[in-house]
Amino acid sequence: MKIAEIAKEAGVSVGTVDRVLHKRGRVSAATKARIEKIIQENGYVPNAMARNLKIGSNLKFGILIPKLDSESGYWHKIYNGIKKAGDEIAAFNISLVIKEFDRDEENSLNEEGKQLIEENVDAIALAPVIQKEAFSFVKSLKDIPYAFFDSSITNASPISENIQIAYKAGWCGARVMQLFSPNNNNFICLQMHESAYNQQQRAQGFIDFFKQKNIPIKTYTWKREKNLSFNKFLDSLFEDNNNIDGIFITNDATGLISKYVLKKELLNTPYIIGFDLVEDNKEELLNGNISAIISQSPETQGYNTIMDMYKILFLKQEDNINKCPIPINIIIKENLP
């Protein structure tokens, strides 16, 4: 068995198995006995790359991610997955360097990315949420491999992508909206970041689903550069849309918008569908104010991205990475985890 297989069988991390194999670090007696029993029964085949790796050699992975405290905690969930993977591979002298950028500040992504390059990282994982800026950055990387999480950009060549297919997610959102409200057709779509490619694709998927049914969708985008506050944006929107049947939101602002809708005296209560199981959205889903949430499994995104880089760059197992997109999980009140 290989080290990853032993770890899976024992229900521990690969780092824990490594500590037992090489008799370093602390491992509980029970865990050690369980791992040793698995090795004794099945054998252990050392990975050629790990066996031949020079003692003291290191790998450094750079992470380029939006501000962790932004967008209701969604990015912090991705960070949790990244950190979990980083802890598991730390035993192999692999370290993480994390830089946060402000997606609402021009050139912030590039500036933070340049700092990663200056730190001589061996690879970079990033969320390319600003399409033009991210494309410019990855083109500047030259020989540094890179991986994407959260979203993708066209004409790029990442070594790994852990993303949800945004267009299909928008289409699914429309399908669920129709199930909730089959006899109505007054729906609107709200996009919170004009430059976010994945949000554009979600909106397009939602629009195209209803287009085939000859139902036009009103689309609104919060354009932050116009210095229009979020509440004023919503005030203006609902002045023109007082009798809507459903609202589709392309990011995790769903809970904020549902709370706003409750305070407004609309002619009817619209169905609300959005993204991400952040705490605010969970609360509103349980209260019945949000109809459904599309989960992107952010922790899984972060974890798989780092493990893919580990497999490709350390283990040299390019064919052993997960190439399936993140599932489009529809969460309602009754199946909330």
Residue ranges of predicted features:
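Hinge/cleft segment of the Venus flytrap/periplasmic-binding protein
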Residues: I38, F210, S297-P337
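Amphipathic helical "hinge" segments at domain boundaries
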Residues: N47-N107
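Conserved beta-strand elements of the Class I
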Residues: G62, N186-L190
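Hinge/beta->alpha junction and helix N-cap segments in small-molecule ligand-binding domains
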Residues: K67-G73, I98-S108, I130, N162-W171, ...
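Hydrophobic alpha-helical segments within soluble ligand-binding/sensing domains
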Residues: S160-N185, N281, S297-F314
